[in-house]
Amino acid sequence: PMSRGLGDVYKRQVEQQATFEGFLRPDGRAGTRNYIGVLTSVNCSATVAKYIGAAFDKEGETDLGNLDGVVAFTHGTGCGMNQGNGLALLRRTMAGYAAHPNLAAVLVVGLGCEVNQIPDWLKEAGLEAGPQLRTMVIQESGGTRKTVERGVSMVREMIPDFKSIQRQTVPASHLTLGLECGGSDAYSGITANPSLGAAADLLVRHGGTAILSETPEIYGAEHLLTRRAVSEKVGRKIVDLIQWWD
């Protein structure tokens, strides 16, 4: 049946939208943090990225101003992999980090011989290198030590452009809440899940977004979500997905 709550569209919005103090980005989005990120195109450049990030961990050695820090984001793939769904997923994920509103700027570190080539990723993601997105390749920089040194230098060059960014009042519609089913114990079912559900409902009423991963976990409660669907079409997609799992 296709009638699992589809007629009750969830449209209750608040009159006065909540706000928070965030970092407004050039693309109009807002973040809750102000980091410089060090990304990797491949697992082989993970150590270099970690060393670059660690160079800024010692408090007081570098004037970061309003930057929250320099953090490395590494993963375990990108090297000898098939150019299929796995590579596409990796590139989408990298693009999401590169454009994340919590990152003022990013440095992307590659090895040089990996399947996930940085130029190909940039082109596919519609990104361009510039002041907010810089890249480097270990095999072109003279090895690990020289790449770390150059990477630290590049981040230091980036810091002055972003350490003076000020927090400003922005609407709660900029917020996205990410949810994942953790331990399936009594506490999650009795306290955590209902509490987070209420928080997600409240955020959505203020124009924000909530994302729940692990889709099968909503089995048996899909009618509660279809009632909140923005349209019947969206509600039907939820029902179709659950029926696919059946």
Predicted feature descriptions by range:
Residues 11-244:
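Buried, small/hydrophobic-residue-enriched core segments of structured protein domains
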